Each structure stands twice: as structure tokens, then as C-alpha cells.
Amino acid sequence: MDSPTLEDRENSIEDCDDDDDNIYINEETEEGHEKVLVTHAPQERIVPPLNFCPVERYLYRSGQPSPVNFPFLLNLNLKTIVWLANEEPQDSLLEFCDTHKINLQFAAINPDAGEDDNPWDGLTEHSIINVLQTIVTKENYPLLVCCGMGRHRTGTVIGCLRRIMGWNLASVSEEYRRFTGSRGGRILVELLIEAFDTALVEIDKKNAPDWLLTSLE
């Protein structure tokens, strides 16, 4: 299965419509495309987090959000943020989640790591499964998966999700490397994704997102 293009994203915003003196956008809703009048520019800058990208409908990925990104995140109406690290995120993100009643889930990379271990390296199979169980449950949506830079740890989890969805390894690898920058991907990450046993993730079809059910048909 090839990687979908940006035009395929269900939650995309369509081109501007300038058929009169007003400015509109055609915004997709559950009932179809609804024309929304834009009356004024936003009062705050709308800046997405580093490496932000929609993954599927109401599922997003990024690096660690900072205060400049919070107005953007509010527009997503997030219910859950999954943090992929042993250490806590910045205090500003903790306060943001607390203020706006967003469930912040800590997915420790290695819960048994000692003080001398590098908290930025690798993901355990157990932690990946825990995150994926959150992702395949629609009651946690809208949902953001993030790590420090939004590259390797987030890429590992999303890569394993794509395996569940039936993507071929070439497409999974291409998506992972799209976010790794000039330094390129890590072969160990790609090997982990390839070896991941997708059967370890339990999917309740009554509580799974629609896009996941479609991919499993």
C-alpha cells in the first residue's frame, strides 16, 4: 500500500473561494463541505509544533510543543497527548494540558532505565504496544503523539501503526525518513518497525477509529 498524499487527508482544508468580495474557506465536516466566512485575521500567531503533521483523521504527530504553538493546538481540540520520553516535558506543556483538560499520557521509553542511561535512545516493545493501544481506541481522540523532535521515537510508533494498517515496508520507511532531516534515519528504528509483531496490539472494532477499520478491510 502506497503512502497517501497530503490531498488524501480527510481533515484537510480546501482552496480559498473568492467568488465575491468576502473570503471563504471550504472546510470539511462530518456532514460534508461547509463554507466558512473568514471575517478577520487571527489575533494570535498560529504556529504548528516542529515536525507537525496529520497522520490520519484527528491523529497528529509532532515534536514537543512550546508556548508559541499552544494557540495552534487549541484549534485541534485535543483530548489526548502522548509523550514519548522518560523525562517529563516542559512545565509549560504540563500547565497547558492541565488548564485545557487534556489527558497527557506518559509512555516511558524504558521504564527500567538507570541514571546513566540515555533517555533519548530507543523504545521498548512494551511501551510501543501501550501507545498503540491508545491510538487504536477512538475515545482518546483527537490525539497528538510527540517526542522531543518528532523524529525517531514518534517515527517508530507511527511506523508500527502503519504496519498494523497494512502498509508495505518501503512506504513505512519513506514516511519515517521524511521527518529525520539531513542526518537521515536510523537503521535500528527501521529494523524495529520491521520486526514488530502487530498481533500484540488488540483492536476492539467497536471502539476503533473509522480510518483504522477501513484499512483492515
Curated annotation (Swiss-Prot):
Catalytic residue list: 147 (phosphocysteine intermediate)
Family according to the record: Belongs to the protein-tyrosine phosphatase family.
InterPro entries (UniProt xref): Prot-tyrosine_phosphatase-like, Siw14-like, TYR_PHOSPHATASE_DUAL_dom
Gene behind this protein: OCA1
Top-rank taxon, per record: Eukaryota
The protein's name in its UniProt record: Putative tyrosine-protein phosphatase OCA1
Domain Tyrosine-protein phosphatase: 51-209
Lineage of the species this protein comes from: Eukaryota, Fungi, Dikarya, Ascomycota, Saccharomycotina
Pfam family of the protein (one): Y_phosphatase2
